[in-house]
């Protein structure tokens, strides 16, 4: 994992958010953005913003192209439930649970690029001179 983005207390049910998240797991950033743009679900815009945030974190921390990365981990956890009362007949009421989600997205480097960076690091020893 190189870059991570978390969004908490999103007002969408985790079950609905997982439908969108499952579509992009393991995909490259460019492909995932295309999938999210054309997915007609309300969670897709939220996950797209989260992906853009993770990409911005990546650009801020290290100077590598975002094309070299893929979504290694993305999952949806259940957040707090807001309990509301819906009035019914004879003075009674039903409980409505407005569910929220916590979404976590992690980006990692592609395996080929990891191997290239390891090879470059082996050429340079601890003091910064070539072996």
From Swiss-Prot:
The keyword rRNA-binding applies. SUPFAM superfamilies: Ribosomal protein L22 (SSF54843). One of its GO terms (biological process) is translation. Pfam families: Ribosomal_L22. Keywords: Ribonucleoprotein, Ribosomal protein, RNA-binding, rRNA-binding. One of its GO terms (cellular component) is cytosolic large ribosomal subunit. This protein binds specifically to 23S rRNA; its binding is stimulated by other ribosomal proteins, e.g. L4, L17, and L20. It is important during the early stages of 50S assembly. It makes multiple contacts with different domains of the 23S rRNA in the assembled 50S subunit and ribosome. The globular domain of the protein is located near the polypeptide exit tunnel on the outside of the subunit, while an extended beta-hairpin is found that lines the wall of the exit tunnel in the center of the 70S ribosome. Belongs to the universal ribosomal protein uL22 family. This is Large ribosomal subunit protein uL22. The gene is rplV.
């Amino acid at each position: 994992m190189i870059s991570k983005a978390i969004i908490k207390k999103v007002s969408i049910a985790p079950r609905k958010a997982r439908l969108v998240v499952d579509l992009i797991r393991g995909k490259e950033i460019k492909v995932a953005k295309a999938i999210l743009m054309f997915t007609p679900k309300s969670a897709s815009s939220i996950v797209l913003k989260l992906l853009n945030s993770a990409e911005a974190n990546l650009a801020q921390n290290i100077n590598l192209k975002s094309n070299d990365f893929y979504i290694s981990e993305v999952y949806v956890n259940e957040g707090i439930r807001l309990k509301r009362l819906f009035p019914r007949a004879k003075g009674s009421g039903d409980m409505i649970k407005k569910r929220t989600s916590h979404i976590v997205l992690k980006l990692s480097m592609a395996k080929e690029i990891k191997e290239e960076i390891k090879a470059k690091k082996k050429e340079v020893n601890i003091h910064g001179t070539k072996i």
